[in-house]
Swiss-Prot record:
One of its GO terms (biological process) is translation. InterPro entries: Ribosomal_uS10 (IPR001848), Ribosomal_uS10_CS (IPR018268), Ribosomal_uS10_dom (IPR027486), Ribosomal_uS10_dom_sf (IPR036838). Pfam families: Ribosomal_S10. Involved in the binding of tRNA to the ribosomes. This is Small ribosomal subunit protein uS10. Keywords: Ribonucleoprotein, Ribosomal protein. Coiled coil: none annotated. Part of the 30S ribosomal subunit. One of its GO terms (molecular function) is structural constituent of ribosome.
């Protein structure tokens, strides 16, 4: 039996600031719900931690080091049965610059 493949938009969001990421996710889900599309998410993915070890002194003291870390928070939102209104509303949506957005159809 042949089944019809459902149309789906997958939106991946990445940010260093968790609160900024969550507000962006809320805006996307609200926009999808206003245009009668079914939004699933935001689904939290594991946070990536990158730790940098730096010498404190420019000269001799190798024992004295300092650690810095960056945390990359990630979320996925799936939008099922998107209409042209949904796509237009998502294109016009104003999101902060600190959030990286990747869209797949």
């Amino acid at each position: 039996m042949a089944t019809l493949q459902q149309q789906k938009i997958r939106i991946r969001l990445k940010a260093f600031d968790r609160r900024l990421l969550d507000t962006s996710c809320d805006k996307i889900v609200d926009t999808a719900n206003r245009t009668n599309a079914a939004a699933v998410g935001p689904i939290p993915l594991p946070t990536k931690r990158k730790i940098y070890c730096v010498l404190r002194s420019p000269h001799v003291d190798k024992d004295s080091r300092e650690h810095f870390e960056t945390r990359t928070h990630r979320r996925i939102i799936d939008i099922y049965q998107p209409s042209s209104k949904t796509i237009d509303a998502l294109m016009k949506l104003d999101l902060p610059a600190g959030v990286d957005i990747e869209v797949k159809l």
